[in-house]
């Protein structure tokens, strides 16, 4: 049994979840090469759809994601990757999770506090 990379232009959706708290940290995409690299190295690696290249999460920030467990869905076209984050946050905007906004009365509002300064980590670019 193999993952189905053919359904979505060679990609599977990767839901990244904190293995201890269960909080969803981010969603990314993996092609076969990124998935293989993730399994081989134990660090979450993705396919950047905008840059069209492999992307080791935490490559520039140092906030890598250590893989603890990988599961797949019934259609074999998505993976759930449980990780231990090596840093204060996963989101490039300075938050623990990329899911820091919540819909409140029809408006998106920031619902979490920043966990680090992205300007200090990324040199002013976010």
Curated annotation (Swiss-Prot):
It comes from the Bacteria. Pathway: Amino-acid biosynthesis; L-histidine biosynthesis; L-histidine from 5-phospho-alpha-D-ribose 1-diphosphate: step 3/9. Binds 1 Mg(2+) ion per subunit. Binds 1 zinc ion per subunit. Keywords: Amino-acid biosynthesis, Cytoplasm, Histidine biosynthesis, Hydrolase, Magnesium, Metal-binding, Zinc. Gene3D superfamilies: Phosphoribosyl-AMP cyclohydrolase. It is an enzyme of class 3 (hydrolase). It catalyses: 1-(5-phospho-beta-D-ribosyl)-5'-AMP + H2O = 1-(5-phospho-beta-D-ribosyl)-5-[(5-phospho-beta-D-ribosylamino)methylideneamino]imidazole-4-carboxamide. InterPro entries: PRA-CH (IPR026660), PRib_AMP_CycHydrolase_dom (IPR002496), PRib_AMP_CycHydrolase_sf (IPR038019). The keyword S-adenosyl-L-methionine does not apply. Zn(2+) binds at residues 74, 91, 98. Its cofactor is Mg(2+); Zn(2+). Mg(2+) binds at residues 73, 75, 77. GO terms for cellular component: cytoplasm. GO terms for molecular function: magnesium ion binding; phosphoribosyl-AMP cyclohydrolase activity; zinc ion binding. Its EC number is 3.5.4.19. One of its GO terms (biological process) is L-histidine biosynthetic process. It is found in: Cytoplasm. It holds the Pfam family PRA-CH. Homodimer. NCBIfam families: PRK00051.1 (NF000768). HAMAP family: HisI. Catalyzes the hydrolysis of the adenine ring of phosphoribosyl-AMP. Belongs to the PRA-CH family. This is Phosphoribosyl-AMP cyclohydrolase. The gene is hisI.
